[in-house]
Regions:
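Gly/Ser/Thr-rich beta-alpha loop segments that engage phosphate groups in nucleotides
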Residues: 65, 71-73, 101-104, 131, ...
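Bacterial N-terminal signal peptides that target proteins for export
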Residues: 2-19
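Serine-esterase "nucleophile elbow" of acetyl-processing enzymes
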Residues: 37-101, 111-120
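C-terminal motif of bacterial Sec signal peptides marking the signal peptidase cleavage site
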Residues: 26-28
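Alpha-helical cap/lid subdomain in secreted, periplasmic
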Residues: 107-241
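Residue-level signal for mature regions of secreted extracellular proteins and peptides
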Residues: 22-23
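Bacterial signal peptide processing site
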Residues: 30-33
Length: 241
């Protein structure tokens, strides 16, 4: 397969919901409810145990609920579906789901060593930042955290793919929303990263691909996300062969 990254990046700031910044994407990754600590710990333990036992480079997905597979069986989560698609294309990779619902960029940074480095990762796919927005964390702090994650990856010779949580509607120039929207492409340019511009392309605003909360993708919705992301990752992973 091949992917037109330029074309993907060109599809920016469109959508049908006049909200600040991707509520259907960002809330989907939002902070867990009050009774969630035990669930979150369970998800974390399950995530770290979900390595696909195959050959090839170790690919760790570091993210929040969209990575963890909120509301879905473990085998239907995004990393697992990506692994299945890659395998069907004859591409071997040992995929690890290190997604934790409710995680912020600070959480991802604090657990990088045991979630990513300890897994002997060759490649880390970073999809974090949504919960920072919901919690009102300053965009500059988010950028610093993501930058530190990228630097940790580099210090450990781990290649990094940065996944953007792109707004679906226009944002006002100079606003906090615009500052958040600029974080990912700016970091990708600064560090020369592989940059995936929109995680929920083809799924956001599609009720038949979302769970009853209207936020989290169904198994079919995740499949759409996985097909797009797998297409993007294929040449990156093939380069390890």
């Amino acid at each position: 397969m091949s992917v037109d990254q330029t074309g993907m990046q060109g599809t920016r700031w469109t959508g049908i919901v006049p909200i600040l910044i991707s509520a259907a994407i960002l809330v989907a990754c939002g902070a867990p409810p009050a009774d969630a600590p035990a669930e979150r710990a369970s998800q974390s333990q399950e995530s770290m145990a979900s390595a696909i036992p195959v050959q090839g480079p170790v690919v760790v997905f570091l993210g929040d609920s969209l990575t963890a597979g909120f509301g879905l069986p473990a085998e239907d989560a995004l990393p697992e579906q990506v692994a299945s698609i890659l395998k069907s294309e004859g591409i071997e990779a040992r995929v690890i789901n290190a997604g934790v619902s409710g995680d912020t960029t600070a959480n991802g940074l604090s657990r990088f060593d045991w979630s990513v480095t300890a897994a002997d990762a060759d490649l880390v796919v970073v999809a974090l930042g949504a919960n920072d927005y919901l919690m009102g964390i300053d965009p500059e702090r988010v950028k610093q955290n993501l930058s530190a994650i990228v630097q940790k990856a580099r210090e450990n010779n781990i290649e990094c793919v940065l996944v953007d949580l792109q707004p679906r509607s226009a944002v006002e120039e100079g606003s906090r929303d615009a500052a958040f929207a600029a974080i990912y492409p700016e970091l990708a340019t600064q560090f020369g990263l592989k940059y995936y511009p929109s995680l929920m392309t083809g799924v956001a605003n599609q009720p038949d691909l979302l769970q009853t909360d209207g936020l989290h993708p169904t198994e079919k919705g995740v499949r759409v996300m996985a097909e797009n992301l797998a297409q993007f990752l294929e040449p990156i992973i093939e380069a390890y062969e």
